[in-house]
Amino acid sequence: MSITKKPKGKNILICYHLLFLIFLFSCSKAPTLFHVKGHKKVLDDITIIIQESGLQTNLGIKVVELESDETIYEWNAQALFNPASNNKLYTCIAALAILDSNHTFSTSVYQDTAALYLVGGGDPHLTLEQLDTMARTISDTMKLHLGRDYWFQNNRVRMRTIDRAKKLNYLILDDSILDDVPYGPGWMWDEGSWWYAAQISALSINENCVDFYVTPGITGQPVLIQTNPVTDFISITNQSKTVNDTANFKELKIERDWKKQTNSFTITGNVMDTASTDTFQRNVHDPTLYSGTVFAEMLQTRGININHVIKAPLSPGAIKLAEHRSRPVNHALTEFMKRSENLTAELLVKHIGAVFYDTVGTWNNGLLAIKLFLHDTVGIDTNTFRLSDGSGVSRYNYSSPEHFIKLLTWAYNDKVIRDQFLSTFPIGGWDSTLDDRMKNEDSTVKIIAKTGTLSGVSCLSGYIFTTRGDPLAFSILMNGYVNEAKPFRNLQDRIVSALTDIKL
């Protein structure tokens, strides 16, 4: 590979670093992208760490001291990478800025003459318990509004009470606040029934998944399966077996027939008879209808029989009977960032579009609103990167370490955003996606960062508060490897660890 642009600087060691890194981490054919700079000690330390790892991948790094805005390390910082879930950093900051921290999501139930309406508001964390509470409210309301029939019999007025709930023929589902496109641009077609690939709908419950509780049965017999919710919306074929030894042991699989877009699940494989109960989450096809079916079943247990569940807009004359409002969006963002929830990310993007443009929320208008914010407020040149979804699942996303450092620096310097934004991050060695990474015995050190993982992609961006109290923003993006991600995560952790003790 020929490099036509020579590295600047008088230090011969920097030239060595550049030649070494070009050899080890060939990131692009564009020669202008190869650029390394920073403090000599940091350059030495990180170069040694990278060399000792023996790993080969496309790599971009940038580290900035936030109080001085000084770059203390940079390698290939303007090159574009698929950021995976580091994309959620854009979504999180935009949600705080555009929706404001007190914004809530509403799910409502209405009634007209012969129908109930369940209206979704894009709540990413609506639970089965909250839906059941609304069903109980509807049941109680119906009992307070009983109808009465009067007639004459033997010259006396007779009266009987009629439960009007029994006359309800339809439960109508309105998810029209957002469009009905279930998958993001650039999502892989074969993600299947995994939790992280749940379809997107304005009417979502239980993360658009069914929980499967798996317990060993009698040896030689199928394992015991319970689900939450218990619903006729799905069917289960249980071909599994409880075993007492590991000979010919087959891993348990719970698979939905997603190719045919059904909600038929097949369970195969083995469970040891000594195993504890385990929980599996699998997504469903058509989450709007799933939510409606489960709600109708909840109503039925309370004596309200629904004959048909269909999708249609809310009738203008319908009367609101019940409403659930979510916690403020800043609470949703903490759970979203720490658990890296893809469904929440995409619902936020579409909801931002609906709020910003006062129309049906879509990926197009939501992402446009976010990019306008990033360009006009954060100062990112949105012509230099590609934002295709809110979660980072899309293979069309491209960002650089430079983009993330601008974002992280702006958020840190914004007095309104900073504390709320920083509180959403996983904490190194403490919780969620970083609970077993970057453990540091020095209590003065704090590392908060967002991970990003796809096949061949491992990224880490966030903040370091060093032993001296210096705040750093960093972004490490890695693309283009074919083996497991763990060695590359370990390399990221070593780089971050070296940065915690730097003396500027």
Residue ranges of model-derived segments:
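N-terminal secretory signal peptides that target proteins for export/translocation
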Residues: 1-11
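C-terminal motif of bacterial Sec signal peptides marking the signal peptidase cleavage site
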Residues: 25-26
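Beta-lactamase-like hydrolase cores
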Residues: 30-79, 99-102, 137-154
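Conserved serine DD-peptidase/penicillin-binding transpeptidase domain
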Residues: 49, 98-382, 498-504
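Small-residue-rich helix-loop
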Residues: 72-74, 324, 349-504
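Short active-site loop at a secondary-structure junction
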Residues: 74-94, 98
